[in-house]
Amino acid sequence: MPGVKKRKVAREAPAPAPAQESDVESSTPEQTQEPEAQEQEQEEGQSKTFKELGIIEQLCEACETMGYKAPTPIQRESIPLALKGRDLIGLAETGSGKTAAFALPILQALMEKPQPFFGLVLAPTRELAYQISKSFESLGASMGVRSCVIVGGMDMVSQSISLGKKPHIIVATPGRLLDHLENTKGFSLRNLKYLVMDEADRLLDMDFGPLLDKILKVLPRERRTFLFSATMSSKVESLQRASLSNPLRVSVSTSKYQTVSTLLQSYLFIPQKHKDLYLVYLLNEFAGQSTIIFTRTVNETQRLAFLLRALGFGAIPLHGQLSQSARLGALGKFRARSRNILVATDVAARGLDIPSVDVVLNFDLPGDSPSYVHRVGRTARAGKSGLAISFVAQYDVEVWLRIEGALGKKLKEYDCPKDEVMVLGENVAEAQRQAIMDMKDYNEKKGSRGKKFGGKRSRDEMDQEEG
């Protein structure tokens, strides 16, 4: 039966092949996009199901169970090529379905030739690693797929025991994986068949480059490699040249900083001292909706969580100085809607599986345009609509103009009646005083633990977001 499926893929895949080959030889993204346009229209008309992409029935049923009704653009473009055994570079905006785009071909290949340590996925953060592992286990449940998560902040011995059980898939952050490759007796990836580097631009932004080089040196040359990224920087280009063999590039973004069409974006130009007031006003306006508030620092994340709790909002913080169990617990509550407000540093901006976020509020602007796109990409996912509002204080104008320039458009100012906002002043001031006391207690309990974030990060700390 697997052989029949292979022949079916071979019949369906050739149509887009010439365009993709020219894509590899082309030196600029603009040249890449144009020859694909007509082929993509034909492909969209023909490949509307996972089965038509070449995915076997067993995995199609798993997709249906998980609620994947139809392939997303990145899945439509990537899966047929991956099933043909090609190395891939996938460029797509956040929320595009990249995990299934690489997980399904790997699982299909695993069914044909099952073996331990079949696939390795490298991810920049612990939360993303757990999410990817969960996707593999859910899609491969009928096959009995075993996945193992190897990340910092967790016990090395228990991880070594998990590796000793020889899972099919390892999902890891680079620092902890390298620790095991160097120190765990009997652990080797010399028979690895598939390597995935997910959120490659983020991996490199977090200074994992030297660790990736060391990992690549101990992996077999005869393997398939998939590199997925939201943007194609010079660092990602260098990583591609070092790790992929004659890859095909698949891009479903038309702009370096594209946001989805169902996302409504606007801004509020307000004094720095009134940001808390406007935040509380907006949360009252969006009461009951799932909201992520992004801040620049761990301290501000924690302060806002205390402030909002004092006002009766169900707010939970998410940042890199929380324990791993606390971070997973916060995400679990937010996903389950037992808490509808998540106050976060950029640890939550990339790749985390939060199915339905209605509103994103940039309480603090990010420092660059890619980070803005990744933040607002938490809403308006999978065809749903969403709203993103950014707070622009008097000191943020230059940064905001750069973001608008990268987006290629001027965004509208959000209509917020000042007199209604100012009415909240007394209650918010009282909550601010309470938050100050709560922060004092919090910092006293934390003690000297925060000092470790001031020095050079160890491998174990590199996969947490410092905020």
Swiss-Prot record:
Where do the record's region annotations for Disordered lie?
Answer: 1-48, 439-467
What Enzyme Commission number does this protein have?
3.6.4.13
A Pfam match is DEAD
Major place of residence: nucleus
Q: Which residues form a coiled coil?
A: none
* Broad enzyme group: hydrolase
Example GO BP = rRNA processing
Which GO terms of the molecular function aspect are on file? ATP binding; ATP hydrolysis activity; RNA binding; RNA helicase activity
| Chain sites annotated for binding ATP | A92, E93, T94, G95, S96, G97, K98, T99
Domain remark from Swiss-Prot or TrEMBL: The Q motif is unique to and characteristic of the DEAD box family of RNA helicases and controls ATP binding and hydrolysis.
Known function: ATP-dependent rRNA helicase required for pre-ribosomal RNA processing. Involved in the maturation of the 35S-pre-rRNA and to its cleavage to mature 18S rRNA.
Tell me the protein's name.
Answer: ATP-dependent rRNA helicase rrp3
Organism, scientific name: Aspergillus niger (strain ATCC MYA-4892 / CBS 513.88 / FGSC A1513)
Name the gene that codes for it.
rrp3
